[in-house]
């Protein structure tokens, strides 16, 4: 099989089979899988994503579209730098070596990529454009620097976005993340929050789960901002944001973030307060915040209720209020908020009912809307009426106003690492922040770098770091932070339209290809990459780089490939090939020591539950691997790797060769009886497989093609064979299978005597008239209960159906010689005889 696969890969390369023009008269179709990080090797878990995209690309080509199906490399990132530290070599060397190896692997799988458009994000010819784009954002005040409390990963020595903190730990290193103040660069994605939110409803071809995740991440809240005066210091106020200002008469405390500015100004830092602040600083993300037990510590401050000066509320530092949401302060209404209720019970604060409820709010918070009670001038109003009324009062008193808040925060793009795109900024003591002039771009990374594992090597590289200011020529220093790697992947899809464009994009090419018709990748990118790419596209539109404002028309999120995990007696992870099964137990191949089989999980390097691609290719071939990862489960669902599954796919491919040989040896028999059922199945299969592929039901399409192959095999084994239909059916089968298993089908297609390659042939057409059945089966009921079935010819009349079904023995038994009261017909489905 490997010889056949290599033969066709060579032919495709020589014929430039998958290189496409930007000036075709055909309708365009742009299919794209999320570009990979060049980690070194592709395992079979990655193959599924690329196989899905390849089926769609090949199918749409056969449908007559000009298909763009490119590939490139998201090549900056921490693993390369970590490898550089480990091996004392430049990350560039490690990265380019990995790219070479992975490109070879992708080609060996027969994927139909247009390699002439390949991009590499660590190539200065690529990132010089994003450096210029950043400067354009800076000129528009969409990029800025500020001191910010950041998530600091002490192992990777870098800043992490909130999305990159999972359960308080760094998403790559697993280290406990701490809070630290650093000067950081930000992009004003919040300026686009409303459009990003509103446009979600137009993304009709995106999974509902992803749309919902983006809506929640943007997190629009409508409410009010208003001020509480501090008791005994009424010149000073605390501003709060609330989505339920109407519950103001149920307030029992003010909750503030651990880093609220009022703490520095007015709070005496007792050991208890200092310890609590330190504890809060380790809470890094909203997911961890939601899981944490609600706690607080009293500051010693009180505020005065805005509508009743006799009511004072304690100011409490809490672990569930964040400085970067709203104002960093809330008023707590325990009767109507679960978090406030939990804290009130713990700290023995008052719980006052302000919305009518058929429950005891002393025990549980009532979180629904309703009629206001115990609320002075708001009594008797609905929640919405009361909200409008109380905001009006805030505005009259000059202490507050209606406001909108977003959970979405500006995107922190600074990373304190070497292997990333340098931020093109120079810091001058005289001139301040100075953009690198366009003519001096790209700012490239130095080659002579010392990797000792401590911080950012750019900070310790004097000849790179120290430069003259472009404005005043005085000594200055370069910005040593590099871009978050999501910067590169937020615009790469535009570069594929013409990867040799002199500017960031070729506008004409982008107008032809964009938006991407189908984008394929993991759901884990729903609130980072996909949101950032949408944001970049909107800004690129305003900068006249593209005409679209949304990058991806359709999105498909594939399931993961899973495999069992294994550990030895020392709790070390083992590769599957190191384990052998004896009976119902597992043992180490070499030591013969007992091995524990763990959970079936996503394939990952860390847990070693990977299946090596090259080993599988040598054993089964690329086509068998492609077929297996698509056939055993719907593409959007997870797939468990199984040896029996891949073996079954290999047998099916071998069967195709046997079928070809058998059919090739058949002699035409003009007297053979036509197999109408087989002919009908051929046309039905063409129709249904096309529909399945369009709906990404690839496993169902494969099942239909297996059914057709079985029917053809059954016909071949008969004494009298309908040779013409068999040959036609087999030709169709080979065409239908081509997007899934391109190597063997091209080989058989050629042997069948076809001159045109399958990769640029048309998808087979079906004859609508052939789909009509000669007969159909009806269920025969008596008084609504099934008593029999009967096969009728399609030409039968209603009267004939009634006569036949009434005379059936199983029906006569219930009629007992009487005439039916009524006969109800559901055409071609049911006849119901009422007795």
Curated annotation (Swiss-Prot):
ATP binds at residue 605. GO terms for biological process: leucyl-tRNA aminoacylation. PROSITE patterns: AA_TRNA_LIGASE_I. Pfam families: Anticodon_1, tRNA-synt_1, tRNA-synt_1_2, tRNA-synt_1g. A motif ('KMSKS' region) lies at residues 602-606. Its EC number is 6.1.1.4. SUPFAM superfamilies: Anticodon-binding domain of a subclass of class I aminoacyl-tRNA synthetases, Nucleotidylyl transferase, ValRS/IleRS/LeuRS editing domain. GO terms for cellular component: cytoplasm. It catalyses: tRNA(Leu) + L-leucine + ATP = L-leucyl-tRNA(Leu) + AMP + diphosphate. It is found in: Cytoplasm. Keywords: Aminoacyl-tRNA synthetase, ATP-binding, Cytoplasm, Ligase, Nucleotide-binding, Protein biosynthesis. This is Leucine--tRNA ligase. It comes from Rickettsia massiliae (strain Mtu5). The gene is leuS.
């Amino acid at each position: 099989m490997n010889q056949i696969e290599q033969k066709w890969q060579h032919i495709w390369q020589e014929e430039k089979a998958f290189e496409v023009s930007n000036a075709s008269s055909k309708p365009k179709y742009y299919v794209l899988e999320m570009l990979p990080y060049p980690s070194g090797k592709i395992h079979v878990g990655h193959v599924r994503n690329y196989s899905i995209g390849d089926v769609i690309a090949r199918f749409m080509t056969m449908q007559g579209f000009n298909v763009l199906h490119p590939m490139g490399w998201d090549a900056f990132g921490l693993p390369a730098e970590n490898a550089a530290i480990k091996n004392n070599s430049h990350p560039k060397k490690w990265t380019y070596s990995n790219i070479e190896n992975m490109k070879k692997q992708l080609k060996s799988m027969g994927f139909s990529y247009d390699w002439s458009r390949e991009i590499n994000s660590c190539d200065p010819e690529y990132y010089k454009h994003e450096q210029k784009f950043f400067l354009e954002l800076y000129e528009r005040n969409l990029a800025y620097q500020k001191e910010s409390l950041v998530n600091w990963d002490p192992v990777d020595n870098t800043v992490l976005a909130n999305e990159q903190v999972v359960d308080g730990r760094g998403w790559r290193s697993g280290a406990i993340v701490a809070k630290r103040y650093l000067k950081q660069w930000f992009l004003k994605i919040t300026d686009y929050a409303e459009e990003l939110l509103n446009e979600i409803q137009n993304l009709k071809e995106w999974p509902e789960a992803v749309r919902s995740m983006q809506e929640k991440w943007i997190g629009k809240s409508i409410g009010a901002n208003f001020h509480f005066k501090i008791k005994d210091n009424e010149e000073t106020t605390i501003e709060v944001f609330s989505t339920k200002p109407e519950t103001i008469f149920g307030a029992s405390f003010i909750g503030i973030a651990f880093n609220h500015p009022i703490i520095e100004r007015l709070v005496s830092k007792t050991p208890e307060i200092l310890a609590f602040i330190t504890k809060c600083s380790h809470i890094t993300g909203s997911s961890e915040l939601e899981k944490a037990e609600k706690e607080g510590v009293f500051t010693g401050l009180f505020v005065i209720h805005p509508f009743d000066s006799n009511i004072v509320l304690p100011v409490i530092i809490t672990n569930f209020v964040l400085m970067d949401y709203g104002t960093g302060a809330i008023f707590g209404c325990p009767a109507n908020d679960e978090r406030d209720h939990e804290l009130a019970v713990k700290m023995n604060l008052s719980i006052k009912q302000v919305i009518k409820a058929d429950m005891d709010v002393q025990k549980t918070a009532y979180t629904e809307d309703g009629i206001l009670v115990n609320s002075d001038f708001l009594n008797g109003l609905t929640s919405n009426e009361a909200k409008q009324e109380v905001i009006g009062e805030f505005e009259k008193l000059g202490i507050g106003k209606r406001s909108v808040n977003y959970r979405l925060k500006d995107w922190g793009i600074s990373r304190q690492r070497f292997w990333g795109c340098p931020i093109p900024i120079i810091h001058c003591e005289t001139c301040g922040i100075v953009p690198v002039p366009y003519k001096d771009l790209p700012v490239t990374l130095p080659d002579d770098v010392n990797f000792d594992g401590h911080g950012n090597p750019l900070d310790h590289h004097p000849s790179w770091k120290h430069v003259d200011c472009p404005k005043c020529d005085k000594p200055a220093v370069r910005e040593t932070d590099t871009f978050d790697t999501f910067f590169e992947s937020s615009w790469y899809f535009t570069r594929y339209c013409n990867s040799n464009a002199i500017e960031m994009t070729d506008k004409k090419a982008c107008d032809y290809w964009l938006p991407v018709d189908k984008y394929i990748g993991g759901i884990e990118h729903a609130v980072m990459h996909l949101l950032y790419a949408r944001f970049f596209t909107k800004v690129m539109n305003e900068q006249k780089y593209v005409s679209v404002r949304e990058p991806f028309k359709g999105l498909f999120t594939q399931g993961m490939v899973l495999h069992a995990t294994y550990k030895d007696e020392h709790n070390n992870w083992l590769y599957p090939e190191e384990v052998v099964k004896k009976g119902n137990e597992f043992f180490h191949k070499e030591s013969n020591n007992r091995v524990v089989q763990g959970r079936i999980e996503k394939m990952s390097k860390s847990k070693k539950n990977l299946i090596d691609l090259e080993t599988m290719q040598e054993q089964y071939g690329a086509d068998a691997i492609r077929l297996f990862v698509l056939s055993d489960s719907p593409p959007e669902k997870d797939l468990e790797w199984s040896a029996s599954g891949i073996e079954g796919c290999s047998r099916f491919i071998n069967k195709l060769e046997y079928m070809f040989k058998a059919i090739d040896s058949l002699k035409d028999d003009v007297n053979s009886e036509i197999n109408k059922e087989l002919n009908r199945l051929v046309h039905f299969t063409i129709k249904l497989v096309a529909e399945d592929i369009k709906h990404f039901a690839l496993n169902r399409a494969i099942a239909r093609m297996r059914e057709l192959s079985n029917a053809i095999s059954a016909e071949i084994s008969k004494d009298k064979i309908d040779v013409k239909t068999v040959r036609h059916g087999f030709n169709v089968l080979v065409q239908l299978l081509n997007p899934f298993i391109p190597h063997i089908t091209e080989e058989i297609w050629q042997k069948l005597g076809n001159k045109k390659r399958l990769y640029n042939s048309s998808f087979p057409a079906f004859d609508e008239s052939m789909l009509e059945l000669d007969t159909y089966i009806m269920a025969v009921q008596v008084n609504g209960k099934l008593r029999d079935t009967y096969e009728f010819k399609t030409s039968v009349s209603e009267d004939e159906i009634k006569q036949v079904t009434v005379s059936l023995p199983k029906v006569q038994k219930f009629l007992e010689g009487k005439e039916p009261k009524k006969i109800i017909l559901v055409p071609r489905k049911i006849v119901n005889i009422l007795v």
